[in-house]
């Protein structure tokens, strides 16, 4: 899931784009969270015996436990979360989904074998691979969020794309997801590790897209082309093209069209482009995803007072959670929801959008940087060729 090796490229090539900090640094901010990715992470938090958390009736409760307590943690730290759920996947994603299903089938068989003959580590490994977020998981989490007074929306297709739209429109400060492809949908800021458990002690990663483009010396189209070449959910990667090669090819040729033409004309025949590789369609899904516009009435979010008795009924009486813990946590939620109405100081000042002239100047700057990097790559290539052609001992 996501873009292969993208974070390592950003870390190496555009380190200024990444900030790491404590969850408290996000106080007073609204954040759009990729719900499906979060639920998946809650479900794979299995115990050492390979079993998910269940109640006495044998019903899985890992997703509810994670959603309830991780959301409480965010509100405790002054964050106003809203969740975005996946809708129907784009048709181009069907191949990736089929492969995921096949891997889960194989993992299920591996899990049964591991239970018979394997170690605890094998059982846990295969258990994680069999996890799938179902409609029931989503429906129960949506019910829980409604009782908590936390807003949510179901995206027409990809949750990450909807999160990015909300962030660009200023409805939220950032999109939160572990999927790096959220950057391809052009969220200004991506937060990672926001829904991780406190015990993992992982800092919140804040990735700024404008700094990513600046560090890479690319415009948005080149960046998306790089991500497609690295391997995304929509297309298989091209064999023998790793992160270093992908970066070099985009810098040298500028676009995927040019890269593909160069590969086809390569006399050494080093690269085999998959027969069905519609990169233009994949690019269009990143640039023109099916999303609700930010001014849609469904995107008018409100954080409500939690229904304490409803939470006790659902989590304690129906799902087997501790009534005392649910009640005390719900009362704390109610109190924190009231105090979270305080805004950050920056919220009092309206951020003026860039003028068209400023946008054009920024685009020119990125294009100039990209051209400089392309020239540098070509010069290095020529220099290597000269050294190679130079006779030994000369």
Swiss-Prot record:
Residues annotated to bind DNA:
47, 70, 158, 231, 233
Residues in the signal sequence: none
Q: Where is this region: I-domain?
A: 122-253
Q: Where is this region: N-domain?
A: 1-104
| Enzyme kind, highest EC tier | hydrolase
UniProt cross-references to InterPro entries, sorted A to Z:
5-3_exonuclease_C_sf (IPR036279), Flap_endonuc (IPR023426), HhH2 (IPR008918), PIN-like_dom_sf (IPR029060), XPG-I_dom (IPR006086), XPG/Rad2 (IPR006084), XPG_CS (IPR019974), XPG_DNA_repair_N (IPR006085)
Q: Which UniProt keywords apply?
A: DNA damage, DNA repair, DNA replication, Endonuclease, Exonuclease, Hydrolase, Magnesium, Metal-binding, Mitochondrion, Nuclease, Nucleus, Phosphoprotein
Residue spans of biased composition, Basic residues class:
384-394
Q: Name one GO cellular component term.
A: nucleoplasm
Family assignment from sequence similarity: Belongs to the XPG/RAD2 endonuclease family. FEN1 subfamily.
Stated name of the protein: Flap endonuclease 1
Native organism taxonomy: Eukaryota, Fungi, Dikarya, Ascomycota, Pezizomycotina
Corresponding gene? FEN1
